[in-house]
């Protein structure tokens, strides 16, 4: 058996297993979840798996109560599980605007499936991860409910420290894997996979054994692991997480629940998958930002951040916190910026009623600071900017950019560095 991973497992699981990035400053933490990235509904992920030989529960998808009833009859199962399809977690404890409690229900009666679906479809489901008003449910998944005699955890993910895919597993599944990594790190197992050679039979067998699959189940589990890895490569995933990866009393190895993350840079060759992206659950401002190749994440503060590069954006949020302020958003311009993008970015930021100041923090490597400056002055004039604006520019054509701003006659506050910019932005809000 392969040696279990100790302290390394904690870091690996903390950093790489389906957890959004965290920005911490002093005692405050902001959780950033970018929903602009591709997200698939549960039924879509399961169909991808099923189409590629991975064992999942039998299921149907319905968008009316009658379809759900007919699907339940067609399943002809001893027990049926009905699941509302939304991207947010916590469905089981959610509440519908119809009054129904719970987005996941078990029943043995197909008629009950129809009755429950009638209270789900077309109604908003509110969970801990949705906005207060919830998210409208458009589809439900009607699946065969299988007994689970044992639950394990399995994930395949890209690990930059290993320069390739890594197989991570634990015989303790069905729970938060980070809790396992923290309390029982010896129960986390890892197999580094050579991306050129692919997964070896010995690696799949060893992981199956470490997960506690014995006898015929060991070969069955190893086969499923290899199929999951092949799917991982085929669809350009950055992570496939199966929790639980379990066995049934009848001796079947089944992927009961799965979450898949995709490499957005592979969209050009994964058009069918990216066409499934349901943007209807996004905040309207996120979809509007995406139209102009802007990455936007709304936060609950009052200082808007207008930055190029995700790392710089996170650092900007951090330093605002350190100086006693709260960021209102995370807006990343990216690389090849045009004046029109700068204008649209300002339009988005000023449309947010929470915003009381705007901090522009640009490091011009690829980005031309002069283009940014021209976009800023145009936006300020045409949008009649009414909130304080603090600008810190550095890099390509910065002197030309500074001249554009200083000669504009607009009330723009310049900053010499990020620390100075954050202090001035926080101070501008404090004066109100």
Swiss-Prot record:
| Superkingdom, natural source | Eukaryota
Entries under PANTHER family matching the protein: SUCCINATE--COA LIGASE [GDP-FORMING] SUBUNIT BETA, MITOCHONDRIAL, SUCCINYL-COA SYNTHETASE BETA CHAIN
Predominant cellular place of this UniProt entry's protein = mitochondrion
Where's it found, cell-wise?
Mitochondrion
Q: Which cofactor does it need?
A: Mg(2+)
Instruction: State the organism of origin.
Output: Bos taurus (Bovine)
Q: Name one GO molecular function term.
A: ATP binding
> Do the record's keywords include Iron?
no
* Protein name as catalogued: Succinate--CoA ligase [GDP-forming] subunit beta, mitochondrial
Report the family membership: Belongs to the succinate/malate CoA ligase beta subunit family. GTP-specific subunit beta subfamily.
Please state the pathway this protein functions in, per its UniProt record: Carbohydrate metabolism; tricarboxylic acid cycle; succinate from succinyl-CoA (ligase route): step 1/1
Reaction catalyzed: GTP + succinate + CoA = succinyl-CoA + GDP + phosphate
Keyword list (alphabetical) reads: Acetylation, GTP-binding, Ligase, Magnesium, Metal-binding, Mitochondrion, Nucleotide-binding, Phosphoprotein, Transit peptide, Tricarboxylic acid cycle
List the GO cellular component terms. mitochondrion; succinate-CoA ligase complex
Q: Cofactor binding mode, per the note?
A: Binds 1 Mg(2+) ion per subunit.
Name the residues that bind GTP.
57, 90-92, 146
- Keyword Lipid biosynthesis annotated: no
Which residues are listed for substrate binding in this entry?
308, 365-367
A Gene Ontology annotation in the biological process aspect, one of them, is: succinyl-CoA metabolic process
Q: Where is this site: Important for substrate specificity?
A: 79, 147
Describe the function of this protein. Answer: GTP-specific succinyl-CoA synthetase functions in the citric acid cycle (TCA), coupling the hydrolysis of succinyl-CoA to the synthesis of GTP and thus represents the only step of substrate-level phosphorylation in the TCA. The beta subunit provides nucleotide specificity of the enzyme and binds the substrate succinate, while the binding sites for coenzyme A and phosphate are found in the alpha subunit.
Where do the annotations place Mg(2+) binding? 243, 257
Q: Which residues carry this modification: N6-acetyllysine?
A: 73, 111, 132, 139, 200, 218, 227, 271, 347, 386, 423
Quaternary structure and interacting proteins, as annotated: Heterodimer of an alpha and a beta subunit. The beta subunit determines specificity for GTP.
> What Gene3D superfamilies does this protein map onto?
ATP-grasp fold, A domain, ATP-grasp fold, B domain, Succinyl-CoA synthetase domains
Q: In this protein, which residues make up the domain named ATP-grasp?
A: 46-274
